[in-house]
Amino acid sequence: MLVMNLQYFAHKKGVGSSRNGRDSEAKRLGVKRSDGQAVLSGNILVRQRGTKIHPGNNVGLGSDDTLFALIDGVVKFERKGRDKKQVSVYAV
């Protein structure tokens, strides 16, 4: 009877620390002004990637999908249909 003892070893060195240790910096996305909060014209309301929240009344959409207030007023988060959200600014 022939008994074989096969052992497999790594064919590449287990390199860890020199090739690890990279991560991108946080992008600081999210809601910047909450519902009912007073804002000035130009204030950023939401920073986002894609239009997860849509612009409503008196809210502008930046080239990077940032939502910002067009007038001085109060922030109001609303539903738009069944599955969409929007943010509006209403004058006080």
Swiss-Prot record:
Propeptide position ranges: 1-9
Origin: domain of life: Bacteria
Modifications made to the protein after synthesis: The N-terminus is cleaved by ribosomal processing cysteine protease Prp.
Any one GO CC term of the record: cytosolic large ribosomal subunit
Gene3D superfamilies: 2.40.50.100
Molecular functions (GO terms): structural constituent of ribosome
Transmembrane segments: none
Any single biological process term in GO: translation
This protein's UniProt keywords: Ribonucleoprotein, Ribosomal protein
Family of this protein: Belongs to the bacterial ribosomal protein bL27 family.
Protein name: Large ribosomal subunit protein bL27
Source species of the chain: Heliobacterium modesticaldum (strain ATCC 51547 / Ice1)
